[in-house]
Amino acid sequence: MKIIKNVLTKETLDKTRLHLQKNIGAYKWSSSEILWNPGLRIGTTGSTLVQETPQWLRDILIPELNKVLPEYEDININYHLWQRGSGISAHSDNDYIFGATLYLNEEWHVNFGGLFVWQPKDEDTMRAIIPEENMLVINDNSETHMVTPVSMEATQYRVTLQIWGKHDPADVRTCLLY
């Protein structure tokens, strides 16, 4: 797992958040209840809302992300709004060159849950991080990872960009974790 801080410029981070704020109430969102394999929802009670990023935003994000991402042939970038009770069960993203998470919340308290937990290759222990603004976590080694459920007392959504690099642009899967 690679952890990189301050990935986006302030201008790009602001544009990404502004687009989200303008579209948060739109009828353009889908749900992890519909999109994700049921095995990924074990131990969670809430739903994660998912929306693709528009091309104009991808055109801004990709040049900055490419400075730190592994090489790929195609990429998907989606907003995820992790609601209370939402999380994702242990999985490895092994169908992709990499899976990555970019955290968009300005602040996130450890008691809100939504911790990113992973097991490094060849280790018996698990590690965890608290979401931090503009931090990117890249899984390019198919390491098992999960997100703990967001607390029912969380005062905000856990907001991320989920990014998947693929080998074949013709692969039209939804790029939601399998």
Language model features: what each stretch is:
Residues 59-62, 66-178:
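Catalytic core of non-heme Fe(II) oxygenases with the double-stranded beta-helix
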Residues 1-69:
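Non-heme Fe(II)/2-oxoglutarate
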